[in-house]
Swiss-Prot record:
A lipid is attached at residue 228 (GPI-anchor amidated serine). Coiled coil: none annotated. Keywords: Cell membrane, Cell projection, Disulfide bond, Fertilization, Glycoprotein, GPI-anchor, Lipoprotein, Membrane, Receptor, Signal. This is Sperm-egg fusion protein Juno. It is found in: Cell membrane; Cell projection, Microvillus membrane. Belongs to the folate receptor family. The gene is IZUMO1R. Glycans are attached at residue 73. The lineage of its organism: Eukaryota, Metazoa, Chordata, Craniata, Vertebrata. GO terms for molecular function: signaling receptor activity; signaling receptor binding.
C-alpha cells in the first residue's frame, strides 16, 4: 500500500494544473465559434486584436460590424442611431465574445442556466466574465446619451419582422435611464455574461474587452489565474475515492 501514496500525492499536486489547462485556449460551443482557436490574419477592424489566436473567422468578424448583424439578426439601432463611440464599444464587446480564446473559466452550458432551448443554436455561453473597471466606465460614459428601450438585451424583443424591435409599450430613453451605473450596463445588457470588476487594467485580475494588438493579449494571464483556482471536481472525487480504498488493498 505504501507504494501508492507517493503516486496519490503527485496526482493531488498536478490536478489543479490539469484542470486549469482544460479551461485555457478554448472556444465555446456556440453558433459562430470555431471548434479550436487558430490564427486569422485578416480579421476586421475591432476584431483585429485576436488575429494571432482567434475563435472567430474573417466572416464572423465582418458580420459583427454590420448595423443589423447576420450573426443573430440583432440591430443595435432599435431606438435610432447610437453615438459612434457607443457603437464602437458594442462591436468590441461582440468581437471579444466571438473571438476570444480566453473565456474558458466562465463558460457554462446554456441548459444549466435556466433556458430550456439554447438560443440561436448556442450550446454554451459565458457567465460573469470580469471586465476591468475602466472598460465598464468608458462604455457607459460613451453610451449614456444614446437610446435604448430595454435593460436586458438577451430576450423579450419583438421579432415579428425578422429582427429585434422594442416590445410593445417599451419607451426609447437614454441609456442612463435603463443603466444608471457602469456596472448596470456591463452586467444587465447580456444577462450577466459580463461582470463589472472592481479591478483595474493591468491588475492581472480582470479581462479587457479590447486591447492594442501590438502590446499583446493581457487576457491570457488572467484566464490562467482564474483557471488555476477552478480544479476539476470530477478528478478530485476519483482520487479521493481511490485513497479511501487503498487500505483494503494492502
Amino acid at each position: 500500500m505504501a507504494c501508492w501514496w507517493p503516486l496519490l500525492l503527485e496526482l493531488w499536486t498536478v490536478m489543479p494544473t490539469w484542470a486549469g489547462d482544460e479551461l485555457l485556449n478554448i472556444c465555446m460551443n456556440a453558433k459562430h465559434h470555431k471548434r479550436v482557436p487558430s490564427p486569422e490574419d485578416k480579421l476586421y477592424e475591432e476584431c483585429i486584436p485576436w488575429k494571432d489566436n482567434a475563435c472567430c473567422t474573417l466572416t464572423t468578424s465582418w458580420e459583427a460590424h454590420l448595423d443589423v448583424s447576420p450573426l443573430y439578426n440583432f440591430s443595435l439601432f432599435h431606438c435610432g442611431l447610437l453615438m459612434p463611440g457607443c457603437r464602437k464599444h458594442f462591436i468590441q464587446a461582440i468581437c471579444f465574445y466571438e473571438c476570444s480564446p480566453n473565456l474558458g473559466p466562465w463558460i457554462q452550458p446554456v441548459g444549466s442556466l435556466g433556458w430550456e432551448v439554447a438560443p440561436s443554436g448556442q450550446g454554451e455561453r459565458v457567465v460573469n466574465v470580469p471586465l476591468c473597471q475602466e472598460d465598464c466606465e468608458e462604455w457607459w460614459e460613451d453610451c449614456r446619451m444614446s437610446y435604448t428601450c430595454k435593460s436586458n438585451w438577451r430576450g423579450g424583443w419583438d421579432w415579428s419582422q425578422g429582427k429585434n424591435r422594442c416590445p410593445k409599450g417599451a419607451q426609447c430613453l437614454p441609456f442612463s435611464h435603463y443603466f444608471p451605473t457602469p456596472a448596470d450596463l456591463c452586467e444587465k445588457t447580456w444577462s450577466n455574461s459580463f461582470k463589472a470588476s472592481p479591478e483595474r487594467r493591468n491588475s492581472g485580475r480582470c479581462l479587457q474587452k479590447w486591447f492594442e494588438p501590438a502590446q499583446g493579449n493581457p487576457n491570457v494571464a488572467v484566464a490562467r489565474l482564474f483557471a488555476s483556482s477552478a480544479p476539476s471536481w470530477e478528478l478530485s472525487y476519483t482520487i479521493m475515492v481511490c485513497s479511501l480504498f487503498l487500505p483494503f488493498l494492502s
